[in-house]
Every structure is written in C-alpha cells, then in structure tokens.
A protein has these predicted regions:
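Charged helix-capping and loop-helix junction motifs
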Residues: 30-35, 82-88, 115-120, 167-176
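Short beta-strand/loop segments at the ligand-binding rim of alpha/beta enzyme cores
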Residues: 11-16, 64-78, 124-137, 179-190
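Glycine/Thr-rich beta-alpha phosphate-binding loop at enzyme active sites
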Residues: 100-112, 146-174
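Conserved beta-strand positions in the central sheet of alpha/beta enzyme cores
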Residues: 15, 48-50, 101-103, 133, ...
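N-terminal amphipathic alpha-helix/helix-capping segment at the start of soluble metabolic enzymes
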Residues: 1-28, 61
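Surface-exposed amphipathic alpha-helices with a cationic face
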Residues: 4-8, 39-42, 57-65, 116-128, ...
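Catalytic cores of alpha/beta
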Residues: 29, 78-96, 137-151, 184, ...
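Glycine/small-residue-rich loop that forms an oxyanion/phosphate-binding "nest" at active or ligand-binding sites
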Residues: 66-114
Length: 200
C-alpha cells in the first residue's frame, strides 16, 4: 500500500496502541494478549494498530487486517532515545512487514552520535519504499524529520522531553501548527484520554 492510500485509510480514524512491557500486567512471555487487544480494537472500529516488538507485531498482523505502526522499545546507555533507536531494530521491523516504521524523532542524539534526521535519511537510503513515522515533541523536530524523509510525523513525544516538560495535556494548537508547517502527514498521538479529545 502506498503512502496516500494508507493515509486515506487511516485519516480521521482512531489508531489504537496495543503494547505491554515486561513489567506490565498484560505482558506474557509467550505473547497472545496483544493480538486479542488488536482484535477488540478492530471490532470497535479502529483504523490502525501501533505495536511494540517483532513478536507482538507478527501476531497482530496475523490476527487483524489493519495497518500496523511498528516500534521496538529498548534502552541504550548514554542516550534518552528508546523508540527504534538503531538500524538493527529497523531491519527487524522491515523484515516482519510493518506498514509504518516509527522511530524517535526528538533532538537527542543516538548512541552512534547521529541525529533523528540523519537516521531517517539512512533508513530511506536502505529501504526507500518503507513508510517511516517520526515520533516528535516540537515543531522544529517534526519539520527536520519530514525534510529528512519521514512520511508521517507523530506528536508522540510531546511532554516527554526536557524541552516539553509540563505539556501534560493534549495541545490542539500545537497539532494545528505542526500540520500547517510540517510537509509530512500528521498523526496526533499522546495525552488523548477521552473520545471527545479524539473526535476533535
């Protein structure tokens, strides 16, 4: 599916995050829980799923016929980056067939010293057909990632970086400004707790 067709499919709809880390109650070593959550989301009208780890993504893609935004969360020493940080994770996500590959697009450097924009350029050079989403916190980050080749920019990280501390609620003005200034397609993510917020 090309970028415009995928965007048309998800535009105006709800993408549901189906994730559980090892310390969380819904995590199991064998998996199987996240695809059930994805099925429930699909039956309730979700237009896409966001998932973490190759195992969960693979199981979810077998369970539902919806686009999947895939990530791999992993902590690295010396950097606050943790969402799809290295090319190793990118290779694994591409191999399991994610529709959109999401990476952290904030201003901190990766373990190898590269910026988010440089990382996205490297991904696009290696996998030119792979759709990429940058999880950003500021307008400047979103623009930089889009100019580097990100097809989608998410507001995922707003409120979770030193520059955006205190942004603990959904910021519609920020989303509007980002959509006006950023050349990539925008996915509003983070601090969306109620149906009324999602509808807006």
């Amino acid at each position: 599916m090309d970028k415009q067709a995928l965007f048309d499919q998800i535009k105006g709809g709800l993408i549901v995050s189906c994730q559980a880390l090892e310390h969380e109650p819904l995590y199991t070593k064998g998996g199987g829980i996240m695809p059930l959550m994805a099925k429930a989301a699909a039956q309730s009208g979700a237009v896409g799923i966001r998932a973490n780890t190759v195992r969960d993504i693979t199981q979810i893609k077998e369970a539902v016929d919806l686009p999947v935004i895939g990530i791999i969360k992993k902590d690295y020493e010396g950097t606050p980056m943790y969402i799809t940080v290295t090319m190793k994770e990118v290779d694994e996500l591409v191999a399991c067939g994610v529709d959109i590959l999401a990476v952290q697009g904030t201003s901190a450097l990766r373990p190898d010293g590269s910026t988010a924009a440089q990382f996205i350029e490297a991904i696009k050079a290696k996998y030119p057909e792979q759709l990429v989403m940058a999880d950003c916190a500021t307008i400047e980050e979103g623009i930089a990632c889009a100019n580097a080749g990100a097809d989608f920019v998410g507001t995922t990280m707003r409120g979770y970086t030193p520059e955006t501390q205190g942004c603990d609620d959904i910021d519609f003005d920020f989303i509007h400004e980002l959509s006006e200034k950023c050349p990539a397609k925008i996915i509003a993510e983070g601090h969306i707790h109620y149906p009324e917020q999602a509808k807006k």
